[in-house]
Design a protein with these regions (language model features):
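Active-site ligand-binding patch in enzyme domains
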Residues: 211
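Internal catalytic or translocation cores that form aromatic/hydrophobic pockets or channels
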Residues: 329
């Protein structure tokens, strides 16, 4: 079964806050749900499908009850930061098969305000965490290996932050709005060699939500039509053989699956929302998705190709996780939201991509250097 053209994004909402000390996580989920419903012109009584991940307090049953929903389909797939891209694909499958007709997907949390639970579980706790396999260290290891294999430099990685900051200056809700230079990035404190502080994403409270529905319903609503035409997902772990190669991610599998279903190529894409937990995350995904050859990512970004109005592939025009928002340490939701804004023509005029009719939203979840998931969505303006 193909989901091509079967599901439309009728509502989007990104919470404007980046710091919410006086709100509960459940309240944030309710606020983003309300915002997406208002964007679509619907009410909660219209929802018959609900999707959430590990950030939802009490899980899917508790959230359905708290939000006052009556659903006939639900999904709580948990794959870290790319969960919401996975949910979009799964919602499209549910809609295509008649399991539901209007799905709500929510993300919310407070990592900036409240304590985060320990990340390591299972095999990680027993065999990896004790040896210093923290998030920053693992991504630093990936960056170092990429440099060793392909000659990538810290200055090239810095161009990704520069592009993100160029876009963030136009986003009134971005956490960091100051435009930075390559020198600024290289002069920021070292966090995990070779990654500097400015190579790392922000930590923010907040969240976001999506409304996904059928073509018939979407055409009856108020927003410009945007549909999902391709989706792919994959998991990569460290067990055996080539899986130990730190220079590629599960995007090498999820990307081609999404492009094949959509019937398009990387060269057709007008705008890219690329997961940016760290600058190295972006570089690896650009290569793995086919926007440049493996090993050429450094030159691709240093040529300014990610800057809207200048480059070949404008990316993360809201400022992304590097500058604007990385709610709950999970950036997949905001990647979809900004892609939809671009396709609707609702991005900030200074960063709006002209005639944007085809976009990609891609994310990862987990740790690139150990085990992680990837999910790729190809979106089209109708």
């Amino acid at each position: 079964m193909t989901i091509k053209g079967k599901a439309y994004l009728a509502g989007i909402y990104e919470h404007p806050t980046r710091h919410a000390p006086d709100k509960s996580t459940a309240q944030l989920h309710a606020e983003v749900a309300k915002g997406a419903l208002e964007d679509a012109g619907l009410t909660k009584a219209d929802i018959d499908g609900y999707f959430c991940a590990g950030d939802a307090p009490g899980g899917v049953m508790a959230m359905v009850d708290y939000l006052g929903l009556k659903v006939r389909h639900f999904d709580s797939t948990e794959t870290g930061g790319c969960s919401y891209l996975v949910h979009l694909g799964h919602a499209a499958e549910a809609i295509a098969s008649g399991k539901c007709s209007i799905a709500l997907i929510t993300l919310a949390g407070k990592p900036r305000t409240g304590a985060m639970p320990p990340r390591a579980t299972g095999a990680e706790l027993d065999f990896e965490a004790a040896y210093g396999a923290t998030t920053h260290n693992v991504y630093g290891m990936c960056a170092m290996r990429h440099m060793h294999e392909f000659g990538t430099t810290s200055a090239q990685l810095a161009w990704i932050k520069v592009a993100a900051s160029h876009h963030a200056q136009y986003n009134p809700h971005a956490m960091l709005r100051e435009v930075v230079t390559v020198e600024d990035v290289l002069n920021s404190p070292m966090i995990s060699d070779p990654l500097h502080r400015m190579d790392c994403c922000v930590v923010t409270d907040g969240g976001g939500a999506l409304i996904v529905t059928t073509e018939t319903i979407a055409r009856s609503l108020k927003q410009p039509l945007v549909r999902l035409i391709g989706h792919g997902e994959a998991i990569k772990g460290p067990r055996g053989g080539k899986a130990l190669d730190l220079t590629y991610s599960a995007g090498v599998w999820s990307g081609p699956r999404a492009f094949e279903e959509a019937g398009v190529t990387p060269g057709d894409i007008k705008y890219a929302s690329i997961y940016d937990s760290f600058t190295i995350t972006v570089l690896m995904q650009l290569e793995d998705l086919g926007f440049c050859k493996k090993g050429d990512g450094g030159k691709f970004v240093a040529d300014g190709n990610l800057i809207s109005g200048v480059g070949k592939l404008p990316f993360n025009t809201d400022g992304g996780g590097l500058c604007s928002n990385h709610p709950v340490n999970r950036g997949g939701m905001t990647k979809i939201i900004e892609a939809v804004r671009q396709l609707r023509g609702q991005a900030h005029p200074k960063v709006q991509v002209p005639n944007c009719d085809l976009a990609i939203a891609h994310g990862t979840g987990g740790l690139l250097g150990i085990r992680h998931a990837a999910s790729t969505c190809i979106l089209e303006r109708v």
